[in-house]
Amino acid sequence: MSLMNWFEDRRKFSGLIGAFIEKATKGYILSERRKDRHIKIDTTKGLWTRCDNCENMLYIRFLRQNKRICEECGYHLQMSSTERIESLIDRGTWHPMDEDMVARDALKFSDEDSYKNRVLFYQKRTGLTDAIQTGIGKLNGIPIALGVMDFQFMGGSMGSVVGEKITRLIEYGTRESMPVIIVCSSGGARMQEGTLSLMQMAKISAVLQIHQAQKKLLYIAILTYPTTGGVTASFGMLGDVIIAEPKAYIAFAGKRVIEQTLRQKIPDGSQVAESLFDHGLLDLIVPRNLLRGVLSEIFELYSSAPCRRSNNS
C-alpha cells in the first residue's frame, strides 16, 4: 500500500492520525496491518503541523483541503490572506487592487530594529507588501469588494497602507454599488506609525458611513482569531452583518491589560466569539467551511429587501 493510499484510508475512519500520536511526533506512522513495519516521514519539508487547541499532529495537505480546520477537535487554525481569498472567491475572478502600495517610515521609528527593516523582513517572509490584500472578485457569481487582513504580516497591524487600501476598496465598492466584505485579523493599530495609524480608524469609519447610510449598500465584517485593538474599535464592529469564526478571540484590550487597569479579575472566555454572541455583539458565528454559503444567502436576502427594491426602481 502506498503512503498516500494509507493516508486516505486512515482519514475515512479516524481522522488524520487518530492513534499513534506519539510515533507521529517522531516522524513515523505505524501500519495497522503490520505494526512491525513503519514508514519514515521527512518532517524537514514541513509535511506536518500541530493543532493549537488539541495538539494533535495534522498532515498539512489534508489540513489545507479542510480550510485549516482541525479534523479532531474542529479548531480553526490561522489562515493566510491568500488562502482566505481562494476559499471565498470564484476561481479566475480575483482582481487585486493597490498591490504596489508600501509603508513609509515617516516617524523614523526604531526600537530593536528600524521600522523600515521590519517592513522589509515581513515583505520577504510573507510575499505581501503589507498586512492586507484588497481586490474585486465574485462569490458564487456575485461581484464583491473584498479585503482580507493577514496576521502573519506584523500581527496584522493597521498602519497607513492598510487604512488607505481599505478606504479605497470601500470607495470603489460604493461607486460600483458592490457589497464590501472585510475579513479582520489584527492586533490593532501599528505603533510604529503613531497618530498616522490611529487616524485610519476615523477615515475608514467615515467612508463606511457613506457606503452604508447614504448609499444603502451592504458591508459585512468577518472577525477571525484574533481581532483586537483599533480594528475592533472601528470597522470590525461597524458591519451591517457581523460574523465571527468559532472560538475567535475578539477584544479591544487584552485580558491582562484590563485586569491591571481595573485591578479586578475578568471571567475566562469573556473575549471569545461565543461570549460576545451571547451578549448581542455579533450576528452570526459561522464555521469557515460554511461561510461561502452563508454569505450567498445574506446577499440574496439583502437584494430582495424593500429599501433595495425602491432604490433600484
From Swiss-Prot:
Positions of Zn(2+) binding: C51, C54, C70, C73
Record-linked SUPFAM superfamilies: ClpP/crotonase (SSF52096)
Primary location class: plastid
PROSITE patterns associated with the record: COA_CT_NTER (PS50980)
InterPro entries for the chain: AcCoA_carboxyl_beta, Acetyl_CoA_COase_Trfase_b_su, ClpP/crotonase-like_dom_sf, COA_CT_N
Compartments, record wording: Plastid, Chloroplast stroma
GO BP of this protein: fatty acid biosynthetic process; malonyl-CoA biosynthetic process
Cofactor binding note of this UniProt entry: Binds 1 zinc ion per subunit.
Functional pathway: Lipid metabolism; malonyl-CoA biosynthesis; malonyl-CoA from acetyl-CoA: step 1/1
Catalytic reaction equation(s): N(6)-carboxybiotinyl-L-lysyl-[protein] + acetyl-CoA = N(6)-biotinyl-L-lysyl-[protein] + malonyl-CoA
Enzyme Commission number: 2.1.3.15
Cofactor(s), by name: Zn(2+)
Superkingdom to which the source organism belongs: Eukaryota
Zn finger residue spans: C4-type: 51-73
Alphabetical UniProt keywords: ATP-binding, Chloroplast, Fatty acid biosynthesis, Fatty acid metabolism, Lipid biosynthesis, Lipid metabolism, Metal-binding, Nucleotide-binding, Plastid, Transferase, Zinc, Zinc-finger
Gene3D superfamilies, per the entry: 2-enoyl-CoA Hydratase, Chain A, domain 1
GO molecular function, one term: acetyl-CoA carboxylase activity
Any one GO cellular component localisation term in the record: chloroplast stroma
A Pfam family assignment: Carboxyl_trans
Subunit structure as annotated in this protein's UniProt entry: Acetyl-CoA carboxylase is a heterohexamer composed of biotin carboxyl carrier protein, biotin carboxylase and 2 subunits each of ACCase subunit alpha and ACCase plastid-coded subunit beta (accD).
Its job: Component of the acetyl coenzyme A carboxylase (ACC) complex. Biotin carboxylase (BC) catalyzes the carboxylation of biotin on its carrier protein (BCCP) and then the CO(2) group is transferred by the transcarboxylase to acetyl-CoA to form malonyl-CoA.
Family under the similarity heading: Belongs to the AccD/PCCB family.
Protein name: Acetyl-coenzyme A carboxylase carboxyl transferase subunit beta, chloroplastic
